[in-house]
Amino acid sequence: MAANTGIIKGNTHEWEMVIGLEVHAQVISNSKLFSGASTGFCSEPNTQVALFDVAMPGTLPVLNARCVEQAVRTSLALSCEVHKYSVFDRKNYFYPDLASGYQITQFYFPIATDGHITLDECCSKDVRISRIHLEQDAGKSMHVGDKTYLDFNRAGVALMEIVSAPDFRSPEEAAEYIKKLRIILRAIGTCDGDMENGSLRCDANVSVRKVGDSNLGARSEIKNLNSIKHLAQAIRHEACRQVEVLESGGVVSQSTMLFDVDTCTTRSMREKEDACDYRYFPDPDLLPLELTTAFIDNIRASLPELPSEKKRRYMQDIGLSRYDADILSSDKDVSAYFESVVAKHAPDLAVPWITGELFGALNKRGSSIADSPVSAGRLVELLDLVADGTISGKMAKQVFALMFETEKSASDIVREQGLCQITSEETLAPIVDRIISESPDEVAEYRQGKTKLLGYFVGKVMKETNGQANPGLVNTLIKRRLAED
């Protein structure tokens, strides 16, 4: 069975994937959605738990206004309609790490609907966002041998559930969507997007249908995918599994699946529940959430420039390629660094240094640009020395490596290492004369038309000066000398 992008070539038919994503994004907030307990990561188990988080009798929820602001901010950044009226509901189910026996969510009246994210890499399309709602996270169960331990630190942490329409037709489209969503959330400061630590988790709803068919097939929901790579692998395997079932005469049941990262396969966890199984009803302890136009407009006015807008500006106003604009707009720290450098130097000088030398050194060390030992100001100083001819581009790379290693300034390193470029014609002319006089055969060949030998003479001069001669001046002097009789 062959699967090419979103089309699966089965034994009897070609099948199309239909995919929708539910993303759970942990809200950046100092305290939980309905209690004052901390949301800090990596704390000792059960040290960040309020009485309400473990459903102690008599405790009541108190809505965290910061979480509401963050949800509205996210909704606006994703072009959603923010609703002035929304309601918190109870979703009833039993699980050991859900102490109350229900989750507070927004089922009937979510905080926002009808947004979209534009894909422009693997395809060109708008993916619809059906709804965004606020809800509580559950605790964490840890199974050790025949025992289960419960950690309620995460219980009650605010999540934004961002639900897409079933608009994806390939794992690649789903992966691009998650990448773009994560970039947006980080840019506006509402979620750190750390999938490895569970700040961003994804459920994928997958079904297949014959190519050309408009009806949707029975779907499986793959739970808690914690990397983009695993998301794509899980979708592809589950779609192929469903095709095998259908082509063998079977029926795909609506079920909840888990993805095994060791075998790259999906397996059934349980039959998927319908909404009625959760017995949703409005939470009697919480009033409806009512937002004013002024509240929404104030948040809209505070939104930073979005990554897509920044990318467009870099391409149109600065003249960057799509590739460079994409890299430099995808992270707010990278963007700030780039804009500080490009304010002083032309993009064709600044961009290669940032995406080449700087990114290469950071990747080798495993650091982010926020932790770079070479600040934007220090890189500007280095490029100043290149621009005014104090050092050559080749020498600048040597200086940069020392800057990255020692955190010293470019000017200090140039002075300590004696790396100033030789730009004096009086100094270089005698060296050029001597090298030409010592190379009569090469001079004769050059004058007979073998002009590629110019590089031979330049190399000799650069070696003689330990690479410190100004290459442009050396070229000029050699050409002038060789043109003489």
Swiss-Prot record:
Keywords: ATP-binding, Ligase, Nucleotide-binding, Protein biosynthesis. Its EC number is 6.3.5.-. GO terms for biological process: glutaminyl-tRNAGln biosynthesis via transamidation; translation. NCBIfam families: gatB (TIGR00133), PRK05477.1-2 (NF004012), PRK05477.1-4 (NF004014), PRK05477.1-5 (NF004015). Allows the formation of correctly charged Asn-tRNA(Asn) or Gln-tRNA(Gln) through the transamidation of misacylated Asp-tRNA(Asn) or Glu-tRNA(Gln) in organisms which lack either or both of asparaginyl-tRNA or glutaminyl-tRNA synthetases. The reaction takes place in the presence of glutamine and ATP through an activated phospho-Asp-tRNA(Asn) or phospho-Glu-tRNA(Gln). It catalyses: L-glutamyl-tRNA(Gln) + L-glutamine + ATP + H2O = L-glutaminyl-tRNA(Gln) + L-glutamate + ADP + phosphate + H(+); L-aspartyl-tRNA(Asn) + L-glutamine + ATP + H2O = L-asparaginyl-tRNA(Asn) + L-glutamate + ADP + phosphate + 2 H(+). Heterotrimer of A, B and C subunits. GO terms for molecular function: asparaginyl-tRNA synthase (glutamine-hydrolyzing) activity; ATP binding; glutaminyl-tRNA synthase (glutamine-hydrolyzing) activity. Gene3D superfamilies: 1.10.10.410, GatB domain, N-terminal subdomain. This is Aspartyl/glutamyl-tRNA(Asn/Gln) amidotransferase subunit B. Belongs to the GatB/GatE family. GatB subfamily.
